[in-house]
Every structure is written in structure tokens, then in C-alpha cells.
A protein has these predicted regions:
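Membrane-proximal intracellular helices of multi-pass ion channels
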Residues: 1-298
Length: 298
């Protein structure tokens, strides 16, 4: 039984890994089309990891176990051990001075939307590297297991247990069918990202920076294309775009699904209330501290 579960878990991990391998071709194609330097490492990384994932998929085809809590734990662990390694490959090839540990750290930080980085002088880093960091964080905001959730219907297995294992979203799912939830998640995430990109453009941010920052803003991650992050722009309009879309990105998917894809208002959700109260308290503390530091008073 355990061997069957491991084989099936390997199949799901390989499928997610194949998706990330295909995503590596985006920076390569962008570099090829625009003329950026540093695109080739993404071609070789995508081919290498993609070939390995295809071999695993062929070796484990036909494995469709019944989803259980134990199986969910196995998949979660497999994913978090393997996907950061795959995503670190372009860093290792494109930045030879970067250690393996640093490359894995950068990839893990992106996928977990932590936002910590070991890279500096970002403005002089290859554009494909900056784009890859944004893509990783964007997918990380969606959730690696949410990506697996979207793919699972094509493997003819259910996936809500996996979603609960990885996601902090505990709200009641407003739609009963997994495939409908998957479609809704994709549309919501793409919609938020697209509108955020347009908002950054309207605020005067350059096109590449707008796309990169939109992906990391909606993901609530924090990766930037500048060492100073959003402070580089010295513009309150840019900051307000980030504030609004980071707030929207922090709301559970179930809220947007209920709002846009059902005919009823979203049910009251304690986690949303707590989220808003936490933001208000934190904002008040920051304002008070800032006023004290600038020697102003109420």
C-alpha cells in the first residue's frame, strides 16, 4: 500500500515539476524575443528538469490511489522537498558565483512568498532572473498545492484534502465540484494580476517592473526588481496600488468565488474579520511610531 502511495505521490510531484519546467521557457522566450542576456540557463534547466519529470510520469502512470490524509502528507512533503530544487536550477546555471544553498534559499523564499532574498544589485541582474523570481512568487501565492488541486481532476482523483493540508484557507467551499473551484481560482488570480499590472502602469511604473511587481504584489510576496523595492519610485500612487492589491491578495479564494461565481453574498468569515482588524491595529501602531519619530503629536 505504501509503495502504491509513494508511486502515486511521485506522479503528482512530477506533474507539478513538469509545469515548473515549462514555466522556465517563459524567461528564455522573453530573452530571445526582447534581446535580454542570460536566457540560455532557463532553456537548459527547463529541458533537464522536464525530461526527468516526464520519465517519472511514464514510470508511475496508472497510479490513482484513494485520497487520504496520509497520502496528502506524503504529497505535501514530496512537493516541498523537490520543487524548490527544480526552481533553483536556473539560479545555479545563470549565477555561477551563487552557492547551491543560496540558490535553493532564493527559490524557497519565492515559492513560500517569504520575500527574503540573497541577491543584491538587482537592477544589474539578468532580466530573465528577475522575471523568474516574480513567476516563482506568483505561483507560490497561488500555492503549490493549489496548483496540484487544479491538476488533480485531470488525474481523475479528488483533491480537497491536499488543499486543506497546504492552504490556510479554512472557509467553507462555496462550490461543490473540484473542477469548478479550479477554474474559478485561475480566473480570479489572473484577473487580480492583470488589473494590478494595469494599475502599476497607470501609476507610472515601467512595463517590465509593472508585470513583475504585479505578480509579487498579488502573491503578497515582496520580491522586487530594485534593491530599494517600492521605495525606489518615491511615489505614493505606487504604494497605494501595492496596498490595495496586497490586501486583495490576502483574502481567501473562497471569498472571491462566492462573490463572483455564485448568486449570493459571501458568508461572514471570521478569518477575514480578523485579517482586517489586524491590519487596522498594525497601521495604527505604524502611524503612532512614525509620528513620534518625526517629532509630531496628535
Amino acid at each position: 500500500m505504501l509503495s502504491k502511495e509513494l508511486r502515486a505521490a511521485s506522479q503528482i510531484v512530477a506533474l507539478v515539476g513538469l509545469i515548473f519546467s515549462l514555466l522556465m521557457f517563459i524567461p528564455w522566450l522573453a530573452a530571445l524575443g526582447i534581446g535580454w542576456r542570460g536566457g540560455e540557463p532557463f532553456l537548459w534547466s527547463g529541458l533537464t528538469s522536464g525530461f526527468g519529470c516526464i520519465l517519472i510520469l511514464l514510470a508511475t502512470r496508472g497510479e490513482t490511489p484513494r485520497i487520504s490524509a496520509r497520502f496528502g502528507i506524503i504529497v505535501v512533503n514530496f512537493l516541498w522537498w523537490t520543487i524548490p530544487l527544480i526552481c533553483a536550477l536556473p539560479f545555479m546555471l545563470a549565477l555561477p558565483d551563487l552557492s547551491t544553498a543560496d540558490a535553493i534559499f532564493e527559490a524557497t523564499s519565492g515559492l513560500t512568498t517569504t520575500g527574503a532574498t540573497i541577491l543584491s544589485d538587482l537592477v544589474n541582474q539578468p532580466r530573465p532572473i528577475l522575471l523568474w523570481r516574480a513567476i516563482m512568487q506568483w505561483i507560490g501565492g497561488l500555492g503549490i498545492l493549489s496548483l496540484g488541486l487544479i491538476l488533480l481532476p485531470f488525474l481523475r482523483v479528488g483533491g480537497m484534502q491536499l488543499f486543506r493540508m497546504e492552504s490556510s484557507d479554512r472557509a467553507e467551499k462555496p462550490l461543490p465540484r473540484l473542477i469548478e473551484i479550479s477554474k474559478s481560482i485561475i480566473l480570479i488570480y489572473l484577473g487580480l494580476s492583470g488589473v494590478c499590472t494595469l494599475a502599476y502602469l497607470a501609476a507610472g511604473v515601467a512595463p517590465f517592473d509593472s508585470i513583475a511587481h504585479a505578480m509579487t504584489t498579488v502573491a503578497t510576496g515582496g520580491f522586487s526588481t530594485h534593491d530599494e523595492s517600492l521605495g525606489y519610485y518615491q511615489d505614493s500612487k505606487v504604494l497605494w496600488v501595492a496596498i490595495v492589491f496586497m490586501f486583495l491578495g490576502g483574502l481567501p479564494f473562497s471569498f472571491f468565488i462566492a462573490l463572483f461565481f455564485t448568486r449570493s453574498l459571501p458568508k461572514p468569515d471570521p478569518q477575514i474579520y480578523f485579517f482586517i482588524v489586524l491590519i487596522l491595529i498594525a497601521s495604527f501602531i505604524v502611524i503612532v511610531v512614525d509620528l513620534k519619530l518625526t517629532e509630531f503629536s496628535f
